[in-house]
Amino acid sequence: MKYFFILVLLFCINLQASQNDGEKLFKKYCWGCHHETSMAFGPSFNQIANQRDSGQIIAHIVNPKSNYQSLGYKRTAMPAFSQLNAKELQDLTNFILSFKDK
């Protein structure tokens, strides 16, 4: 039981660090069009988190033109962010998903 508690604690610390890194990426790449809980040019992270899973979010960040119709959009003005590596994509996605139900 003690080891389980330690593993849970380590997971929570890693998730928080990932979300912090994701917030930095949000401020660098996303803030001009998206806000955390209110509508801007693009949907809020709250709206995205409540309607998408992590795979859909990552696919849309990397290549929005590939799946915008399947996500219910008629068009997309979002540029591709294919320069982000796998860790950055996961960090940004963890940050976005932290707004679920907020």
Sequence positions of predicted segments:
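Sec-dependent N-terminal signal peptides
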Residues: 4-13
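Acidic/polar helix N-cap motif
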Residues: 13, 18, 85-88
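Sequence/structural segment immediately N-terminal to covalent heme-attachment motifs in c-type
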Residues: 18-36
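Gly/Gly-Pro-rich "capping" loops immediately C-terminal to redox-active cysteine motifs
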Residues: 23, 35-63
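Short sequence/structural segments immediately N-terminal
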Residues: 23-25, 71, 102
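Axial heme c-ligation environment in periplasmic c-type cytochrome domains
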Residues: 41-49, 64-100
